[in-house]
Amino acid sequence: MWWNAGVLKIATVPLIVGTFAWGWHASAQAGGNPSWSSKLNLKSLEDIPDRMRVPLSREDQPQVLVKVTLTNGKVSRVINNCEDYLNAVTAGFYPGDNFVNKETGSFTSQCYVLRDLQHAHAVASGGTYEWSRDSLSQLPPLLVVGSREVTDAGEQAEKRGESWQQFDPTLKVTSVAQDVLEADDGSDSYSLQILARGDFTGGGVEDIAVYGCAVGDQSTWFECEYFVFSLTSQGKLARQTEDSAPYALKPQVSHDN
């Protein structure tokens, strides 16, 4: 979920989610080092502090810089880089309307993963996770569309250990690649893109940082969120981030819980 500030999730312009072929970068550390998508425009982990201060641009139009105005209900802040964005969100600022909510997409897809990469460790054990047609049965319910009653049901299903596929049996994979998984349930389309890999939680195994979006098939509804997942010994992907901005990492528990 985005915010608890009564912000509607219907925009006048639909968010278009596409599948892109991006290269990958890895840090210079030895073995099991963190890696990330080239879309982050990051050469090394040491460059993150500077990268956080660079004004963001649109993903589809790199020449166009992005600015958003966030509010806390009393005052507003004009934001154009990740450092200011994360500071504002952590302080309780949020988009004041649907248009601003749409414009925050570039920040959601870049700022949180840069934040978490700063503290990522080399992976000590385990393999690399890639999307497959089984991923819907491994993921918890995500990007749940509907009333508060429906979203609450999704949260309860996740606590019970249900998969996204169990919670929404109509959900079907429409496209799968190494880093992008797309699905549709007949009403909404979903896209999950792996942005980075590494040990983000200190558990010693690989975690994946993911940018996920839901788009209404016949409407302009949309929602985009940031996630970190760990693969458990039961073959499930456990969500390691809170379910609303600023998507803080949860206190670390066993990956097998």
Role assignments for model-derived ranges:
Residues 19-26:
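C-terminal segment of classical bacterial N-terminal signal peptides
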Residues 203:
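Acidic carboxylate motifs that coordinate Ca2+ or other divalent cations, activating on Asp/Glu
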Residues 1-14:
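Bacterial N-terminal signal peptides that target proteins for export
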Residues 1, 22, 252-256:
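Intrinsic disorder/low-complexity signature
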Residues 28-200, 211-257:
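Beta-propeller-forming repeat regions
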